[in-house]
C-alpha cells in the first residue's frame, strides 16, 4: 500500500524526536512519516518548518524547542552552528555516549535483524582537545578577507576560526602562526574555482606520547615567499616543533595532499606510540587521530581475539599494520592483507621498527590472498577485519567464512555496514556474540565498534 505523505514544503508542524540519525540530526515521526531535524535531540518536542519532502522522509528546519531534553547543553565552540566538524556539542557527553550505543543497537536490530548485546560505549576521559592531526583549509572571501578554519556542513565554504576545540593545542598554534604570516606578507590563499593562490591547507600533527610536533603547509606551487620567516615563527610559537614540511598539490581538485613533499626544517617524520609499539609518522602517513581512544579500541580487539601465543591471525584491511602489530606480540604469527601498496610499505617499516619478526604483510585483494594462504597451508585461528565505511566486500566475507577461523573480530566505523556484514556472516556459519562501541570522535556523530563473532 502506498504511503500517504502528510506534509508538504513550507508546512509548520510540531513533533516529538525519538532518536538521532547517522549525521547527528534528530529523527521523529509526524503521522507515522519520518522527519529529520538538525539540532533537535531525543525526547524533545519541537516546532519545525518543512524544507524538503521525499517519498519516505522529510527534512525540517528547527524553529522552536517546545520541550527541551534534560541532556541539552550550550555548545562550547563559538562557530559550532556554522562549522561542519562537530555535530553533537549541544548534547551532554553522557547523552552522546548513550545515543551512540543506541545508534549501534538500532542498526544491528533494524538492518541486520540481530539480537546481540551492545555494551556501554567506551568514552573518552577527555572529550575535548583530542585530535592529534588537523587540516585547516585556507580561502579568501568575496571581500578579500582571509579565512582559515573548517568547512561548513556539506560545503567547501571555510568557516573562519582561531582554534578548533577538539584539536590538540599545538595544531591550533600552527594554524594561528601561519595565519599571521599570511596576513603580514599578503600571502594568497588557494581558490578552488580559479586554481589560483598559494596556500591550500595548513596541517598539524602531534605525537601525543613523544611531544613531537610537525607543521605541514600544503601549497599549489613550489616557491614559498618569506619561507625563512615562516619557519622561524613556527619554531618560536609552536611548542615541541621538530619538523616543518611542504606538500605540493598542483592539481585543481579537492583532494587535500599532492604526491610531492619536501622537508623545510628538521625531521621528515615525528614519533609516537600506541601501547608498547612505536611509530614514525610522516606528513602523509595514516595514524589514528585519537591516540588515547585508539588504545582502548585495540585493547578490546586484543581481548576479543583471546590470544594465548599459539594462534595464527590474519588482519584484513590492515592499513599501516597498527592492529596487526598490536596483536603480533600475543600471537604465533600474524598476516596483514591490504590492497593499498604505500600502506603495506609503511606496515613493513613499522614491523621492522618494532622488531615484530612474526608479522608478514601482503599487498593484494583479501578475497584472492586468503585462499592463497589457505592453499599454502596457513590455517588462521582468528581473522580481524577493519574495513572502510562501506564495510567488507561480500567476496571477502565469503573467503573468511570458507577459511573457517574460530573467531572473527570486526572493527567498524559504520554501524549500518557492520549490521549488513554481521547478518551475512550469521548466514555463513558464524554468530555475533557481543558488540563494544568506542567513542573515537567525541562531539561528532561518528562511532566505532568492535564485535566478536565465533563459529556457530
Model-derived segments and their meaning:
Residues 1-75, 79, 360, 368:
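Terminal RNA-binding accessory module
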Residues 49-53, 137-141, 205-209, 456:
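Short beta-strand micro-motifs enriched in acidic
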Residues 26-31, 149-152, 216-218, 347:
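Short, acidic/hydrophobic/Gly-rich beta-strand patch recurrent on exposed beta strands
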Residues 2-11, 22, 222, 226-456:
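Rossmann-like S-adenosyl-L-methionine
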Residues 57, 210-214, 445:
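Conserved loop-to-beta-strand segment in the C-terminal subdomain of adenylate-forming
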Residues 63-75, 81-189, 209, 224:
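Extended interfacial segments that mediate partner engagement and assembly in macromolecular machines
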Residues 202:
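Flexible loop/N-cap segments at domain edges
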Residues 43, 167, 290:
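Short, conserved phosphate/pyrophosphate- and ester-handling motifs at nucleotide-, phospho-/glycolipid
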Amino acid at each position: 500500500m502506498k504511503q500517504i505523505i502528510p506534509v508538504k514544503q513550507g508546512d509548520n508542524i510540531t513533533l516529538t524526536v525519538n532518536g538521532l540519525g547517522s549525521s547527528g540530526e534528530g529523527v521523529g515521526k509526524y503521522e507515522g512519516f519520518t522527519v529529520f531535524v538538525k539540532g533537535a535531540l531525543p525526547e524533545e518536542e519541537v516546532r519545525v518548518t518543512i524544507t524538503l519532502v521525499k517519498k519516505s522522509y522529510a527534512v525540517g528546519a528547527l524553529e522552536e524547542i517546545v520541550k527541551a531534553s534534560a541532556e541539552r547543553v550550550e555548545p562550547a565552540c563559538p562557530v559550532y552552528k556554522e562549522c561542519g566538524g562537530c555535530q553533537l556539542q549541544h548534547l551532554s557527553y553522557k547523552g552522546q555516549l548513550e545515543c551512540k550505543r543506541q545508534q549501534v543497537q538500532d542498526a544491528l536490530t533494524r538492518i541486520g535483524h540481530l539480537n546481540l548485546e551492545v555494551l556501554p560505549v567506551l568514552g573518552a576521559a577527555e572529550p575535548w582537545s583530542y585530535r592529534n592531526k588537523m587540516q585547516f583549509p585556507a580561502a579568501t572571501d568575496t571581500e578579500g578577507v582571509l579565512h582559515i578554519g573548517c568547512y561548513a556542513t556539506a560545503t567547501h565554504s571555510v568557516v573562519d576560526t582561531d582554534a578548533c576545540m577538539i584539536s590538540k593545542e599545538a595544531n591550533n598554534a600552527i594554524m594561528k602562526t601561519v595565519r599571521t604570516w599570511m596576513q603580514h606578507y599578503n600571502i594568497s590563499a588557494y581558490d578552488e574555482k580559479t586554481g589560483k593562490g598559494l596556500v591550500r591547507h595548513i596541517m598539524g600533527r602531534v605525537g601525543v606520547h613523544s611531544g613531537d610536533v610537525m607543521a605541514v603547509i600544503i601549497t599549489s606551487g613550489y616557491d614559498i615567499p618569506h619561507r625563512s620567516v615562516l619557519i622561524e615563527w613556527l619554531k618560536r610559537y609552536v611548542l615541541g616543533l621538530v619538523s616543518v614540511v611542504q606538500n605540493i598539490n598542483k592539481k585543481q581538485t579537492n583532494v587535500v595532499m599532492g604526491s610531492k613533499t619536501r622537508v623545510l626544517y628538521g625531521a621528515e617524520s615525528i614519533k609516537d606510540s600506541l601501547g608498547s609499539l612505536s611509530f614514525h609518522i610522516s606528513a602523509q602517513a595514516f595514524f589514528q587521530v585519537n591516540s588515547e581512544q585508539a588504545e582502548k579500541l585495540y585493547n578490546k580487539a586484543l581481548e576479543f581475539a583471546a590470544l594465548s601465543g599459539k594462534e595464527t591471525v590474519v588482519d584484513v584491511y590492515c592499513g599501516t599494520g597498527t592492529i596487526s602489530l598490536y596483536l603480533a606480540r600475543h600471537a604465533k604469527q600474524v598476516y596483514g592483507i591490504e590492497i593499498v601498496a604505500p600502506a603495506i610499505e609503511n606496515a613493513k617499516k613499522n614491523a621492522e621498527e618494532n622488531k615484530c619478526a612474526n608479522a608478514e604483510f601482503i599487498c593484494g585483494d583479501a578475497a584472492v590472498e586468503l585462499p592463497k594462504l589457505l592453499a599454502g597451508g596457513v590455517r588462521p585461528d582468528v581473522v580481524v577485519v577493519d574495513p572502510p565505511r562501506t564495510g567488507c566486500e561480500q567476496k571477502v566475507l565469503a573467503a573468511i567464512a570458507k577459511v573457517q577461523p574460530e573467531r572473527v573480530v570486526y572493527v567498524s566505523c559504520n554501524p549500518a555496514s557492520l549490521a549488513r556484514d554481521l547478518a551475512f556472516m550469521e548466514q555463513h556459519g558464524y554468530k555475533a556474540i557481543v558488540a563494544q562501541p568506542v567513542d573515537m570522535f567525541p562531539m561528532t556523530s561518528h562511532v566505532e565498534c568492535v564485535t566478536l563473532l565465533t563459529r556457530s
